[in-house]
Regions:
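Contiguous, glycine/small-aliphatic-enriched amphipathic segments in soluble metabolic enzymes
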Residues: 1-128, 171-256, 260-266, 272-283, ...
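Ligand-binding beta-strand-loop-alpha-helix segment within the catalytic cores
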Residues: 145-174
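Glycine/threonine-rich beta-strand-loop-alpha-helix active-site module
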Residues: 120-142
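Short, flexible loop segments at boundaries between secondary-structure elements
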Residues: 135-150, 278-294
Length: 324
């Protein structure tokens, strides 16, 4: 469902009008009243049924897994940041995680949440990825952005920039490379993946003139990953790497921090990219955009990214059934 005051319900409903119902049985986790509110606004024609257990889900329908209303129906205020909406969004995510862990569902596709709203609701996590890691007790979770052959993963995620340098260490990079390599094989079906690693400093340190991290930390991490059988190259300067389309020579790119990876990714893929959490015991994807409160409830949201997230989750399910 996502934050019901954002564009989450809208993009899910729009995407559910385009999926292949012979391939998947969708279970929409949230409030039926929220679904009905936006379905009516969008003049949707979906066949809908309410369920209390995934065993009751039927093909050809949007099966709504009702959460309950905390004793009252939610008051929907499109565009507003509210704790009740944040709490409901996280409750839906938590339910989805549990259903996947119990193998009642095969994958989880999350709609956008508001980091501010979930904080107001008492959830002290910076985002989906960290919450998923906590709930599944996963120690090595990798945030990866995907658009067809463009795949960008991150060493650090939602940390302030001033803290990034202290978080870049050899073991962290090696662990990220291991998770990334395994995901490229098991989720994407790439038999012998090639990974590029970006530097931390401008011009990848320029031989130590603009920082030592490339020499002291990143290059040794790459060398050790190579010794473990992972094909990884670098560190490459972050600015020229994407500009020269060097990324097209690799199956994935490992960036050191959030904006280093996501600015070029979204420049090349905005509205079409997918956020994937590698390293979890479950499959989880999401669109690469946020709640977009400014256009919520106005039938202006583009569902392309959510649809891509749904279809990528379908691909991962099949790839895990038929490993390379």
């Amino acid at each position: 469902m996502g934050d019901y005051n954002g564009i989450g319900p809208e993009v899910t409903i729009k995407a559910l009008q385009k999926i292949d119902y012979e391939k998947s049985i969708p279970v929409w986790i949230g409030y039926k009243s929220v679904f009905d509110f936006y379905h009516h606004k969008l003049k949707g024609q979906l066949r809908v049924r309410e369920i209390s257990a995934c065993d009751d889900a039927k093909p050809g329908f949007v099966n709504i897994f009702e959460l309950g209303h905390f004793g009252k129906s939610p008051v929907i205020n499109p565009g507003k940041i509210e704790p009740d909406a944040g709490k409901a969004a996280m409750r839906a995510v938590e339910t989805g995680i549990d259903l996947c862990l119990e193998e009642k569902t095969d994958a989880l596709v999350t709609a956008p949440i508001s980091k501010e709203a979930i904080q107001l609701a008492g959830y002290n996590v910076p985002g989906h990825t960290e919450f998923l890691a906590q709930k599944t007790d996963s120690k090595q979770v990798l945030m990866m952005l995907v658009n067809n052959g463009l795949r960008v993963a991150l060493v650090t995620i939602h940390e302030p920039l001033k803290e990034v340098t202290s978080l870049i260490d050899k073991n962290r990079i090696i662990n990220r490379l291991i998770v990334l390599n395994n995901s490229l094989i098991n989720d994407f079906g790439i038999e012998s993946p090639k990974i590029a690693v970006l530097g931390l400093n401008p011009h990848a340190g320029d031989g130590g003139v603009i920082g030592q991290e490339e020499i002291d930390i990143i290059a040794p991490a790459i060398a050790e990953a190579n010794e473990q059988g992972i094909t990884a190259d670098g560190p490459f300067p972050g600015d020229g790497y994407f500009g020269t389309r060097m990324n097209e020579q690799y199956d994935a790119t490992l960036a050191m921090y959030h904006d280093q990876g996501l600015i070029p990714f979204k420049t090349l893929s905005f509205g079409k990219g997918v956020n994937f959490s590698a390293g979890l015991p479950i499959i989880r994807t999401s669109p690469d955009h946020g709640t977009a409160f400014s256009i919520a409830g106005k039938n202006k949201a583009d569902d392309s990214s959510f649809l891509a997230a749904f279809q990528l989750a379908e691909n991962f399910i099949e790839n895990r059934k038929h490993p390379v």
